[in-house]
Amino acid sequence: MMETLCKRLSACQDAILELYERDSIHLSDHIDHWKHVRLENVLLHKAREMGLQSVNQQAVPSLAVSRSKGHNAIELQLALESLNESSYNTEEWTLQQTSWEQWVTDPKQCFKKGGKTVEVRYDCDKDNTMQYVVWTFVYYWLEGKWYKVSSHVDYNGIYYETQDNEKVYYTQFDRDAKRYGVKGIWDVCMGGKVICFAPVFSPCEVSTPEIVRPLHTSNSSNAQDAGVPTRKRHRQCDPDEGPLDFVHNLQPTTDSSTQCTLHNVAPIVHLKGDKNSLKCLRYRMHKGYSHLFNNVTTTWHWTNNTNSKCGVITFMFSSTSQQKQFLQCAKIPPTISVSSGYMSI
């Protein structure tokens, strides 16, 4: 039995060596390669079970090692067989592109082609850099089908867009910024272009951002449906004003002699734009400037909004003076639109 095992292992390894030397660009050959790798580890696993320390002057790995490598070979063989049944089977595929090492490189369990280097300078320091790979093409599996998409880079990280226009980040720079930097900022350099850190806030001398349109809200249920927090606030008002039927009729006054308490009104600011940009903007505001607002929503959108990429976040303030300070001190990116007003709560 030992002699048979030795012969089969030798024949299997010869076939693997031949496939390496062939340097094929066809999926069928790479599938054959992983079949032989799988068989090789089955034979080595059996040899270890038989108590053998070496076969054909080759050290026999532990049971755990041969089992793990065998499972890896099965995983890649099945992935390549399904890829071979797709429309991408006529493309050229190299041994490296179908290797286990590249299969588990981010984005994991995807095939990748055309790697390019992007450099990130943490703390915007050219002596504190890291290099990452941006793949020209990413092949991902979803619901029984392979899709081919491109990778992109922005300030947040490296991502690809799915067929549903969803961004899937497989590298996020803020995570490494905590490890390699102290300021929480970085520059992204690629192809002669630099994406720099754009501060959320500047000194209060900065002019107020352009107001796109005033916000008029007369029904508290609309705001609640949108996920806006409902907390009572106090503000100044004219005691001669009538019932609060329409919030946009409220005109705050600074006359201390005419103070009254309204329990159902709060100043707010809507920021509207790309969902991922809003998420990063909210994160940076929470991190260092939470004193300039009282509360903030998650990203939300109106139910009749057909633009799936566009979202809104709403900031709530305890007073009109805090709202004014926010608008004066906030440096909102030009891609984000601003709406301010009041909301009944």
Curated annotation (Swiss-Prot):
Transmembrane segments: none annotated. Phosphorylated. Sumoylation plays a regulatory role in E2 transcriptional activity. Residues 215-237 are annotated as: Disordered. This is Regulatory protein E2. Belongs to the papillomaviridae E2 protein family. Residues 266-345 are annotated as: DNA-binding domain. It is found in: Host nucleus. GO terms for cellular component: host cell nucleus. GO terms for molecular function: DNA binding; DNA-binding transcription factor activity; nucleotide binding. Its main location: host cell. There is a cross-link at residue 272 (Glycyl lysine isopeptide (Lys-Gly) (interchain with G-Cter in SUMO)). Residues 1-202 are annotated as: Transactivation domain. One of its GO terms (biological process) is DNA replication. InterPro entries: E2/EBNA1_C_sf, Nucleotide-bd_a/b_plait_sf, Papillomavirus_E2_C, PPV_E2_N, Reg_prot_E2, Regulatory_protein_E2_N, Regulatory_protein_E2_N_1, Regulatory_protein_E2_N_2. It holds the Pfam family PPV_E2_C. Binds DNA as homodimer. Interacts with protein E1; this interaction greatly increases E1 DNA-binding activity. Interacts with protein L1; this interaction enhances E2-dependent replication and transcription activation. Interacts with protein L2; this interaction inhibits E2 transcriptional activity but not DNA replication function E2. Interacts with protein E7; this interaction inhibits E7 oncogenic activity. Interacts with host TAF1; this interaction modulates E2-dependent transcriptional regulation. Interacts with host BRD4; this interaction mediates E2 transcriptional activation function. Plays a role in the initiation of viral DNA replication. A dimer of E2 interacts with a dimer of E1 in order to improve specificity of E1 DNA binding activity. Once the complex recognizes and binds DNA at specific sites, the E2 dimer is removed from DNA. E2 also regulates viral transcription through binding to the E2RE response element (5'-ACCNNNNNNGGT-3') present in multiple copies in the regulatory regions of the viral genome. Activates or represses transcription depending on E2RE's position with regards to proximal promoter elements including the TATA-box. Keywords: Activator, DNA replication, DNA-binding, Early protein, Host nucleus, Isopeptide bond, Phosphoprotein, Repressor, Transcription, Transcription regulation, Ubl conjugation.
